[in-house]
Amino acid sequence: MDRFVYKSGEKLRCGYTTGSCAAAASLAAAEALLTGAPPERVELPTPKGITLDIPVAGCRISGNSALCSVIKDSGDDPDITNGIEVCARVELTEAGISIDGGEGIGRVTKPGLDQPGAAAINSVPRKMIAAAVSDIAETCDYHGGFRIVVSVPNGAELASRTYNPRMGIEGGISIIGTTGIVEPMSNSALVDTIRLEERMRREEGCRSLLLTLGNYSQSFIQRNMPFALDRCVTCSNFIGEAIEAALEYGFERILIIGHIGKMAKLGAGIMNTHSAQADGRMEVLVTCGLLAGADVDTLKKITECVTVDAAVSLLQDAGALEKSMEILGKRAEYYLAAKVKSSVPIGAVMFSDKFGILVRTPSADGLIERISEEYNG
């Protein structure tokens, strides 16, 4: 893929997601069926607004179906899926579009994830696949339907080296991606970007620092909090590094706002929230629930949850949610205060799309008021 980004002065090549691969393979197979000519390349629009030109690795027509494949290209940010073959078998049907997973595609066995009970092909890739075959159908004046089965040879073996089995996705990998594009960014480049943004805010005269974890946080702030977003700094998973930089640059107070699915880890003092670094979310919630008086059956069920929202629902049903979240807030602030050695006020707000604001650490309300006055004054 000939698209590049620059990170810390380094030119890095972008790649495309497994979702884009599945959509491209599906498009190639549908085109081969409808035209009788297997394509060598396909053009695929992505949610990012970028049209990809993806080579087709293989294509075979057999009667009423075709099987095509593409090779995953992760660019200069390769992961475990880089170089894998993503296949799609497309069969013509009377009407409608059905999408399923075959060999090497996991099945979602637990609630709370995208596509529960179905193949682990997430919502955006499913939409991309459906749009791709619909477009070629319109071009070829075809009015029937498609049955599409996505597969990844060796996907089951690959999945054993991921978090899929632990998350309740069994038998293979997931087809994922929200933009269709993989933009490479090394950890050091991310931290450098965070430090640069913090330094800029300090040089602009900001005395307070509002850290967000990403797009979810910023969307939530826009809807629910009294802050101007142009002064926020996104720290992604790197809460610890962002706090260290804030102290270095002399910020007088720090507030962190993020989804509880990440931020619950603060209750165990985990300052890098990437899943590859540490988890501990359910362990934290079990501890908070225990201290809040939740019954043993509820606590056992929490240990089996995949998502924090599912665990929160259990605590709510047990009548222990409010107290559990209060305890989580105190634990999180204890570790945050230890991180800054109590040198500046620091607090956090944790939310979920389903439940709204769940946690305000003890210092949070005061920080919200002070930062709101500074940012909006």
Go through the PLM ranges and name each one.
Residues 85, 224-227, 361-367:
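Surface-exposed flexible segments
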Residues 109, 158-160, 221, 266, ...:
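Short acidic, gly/pro-rich beta-turn/loop elements at beta-sheet edges
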Residues 3-6, 13, 167-173, 178-197, ...:
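A structural signal for small-residue-enriched, beta-sheet-centric alpha/beta enzyme cores
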Residues 42, 190, 194-199, 364, ...:
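Bulky hydrophobic/aromatic packing residues
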Residues 345-376:
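Short, amphipathic C-terminal "tail helix"
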Residues 1-161, 165-167, 364:
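Generic N-terminal targeting/processing segments that precede catalytic cores or assembly contacts
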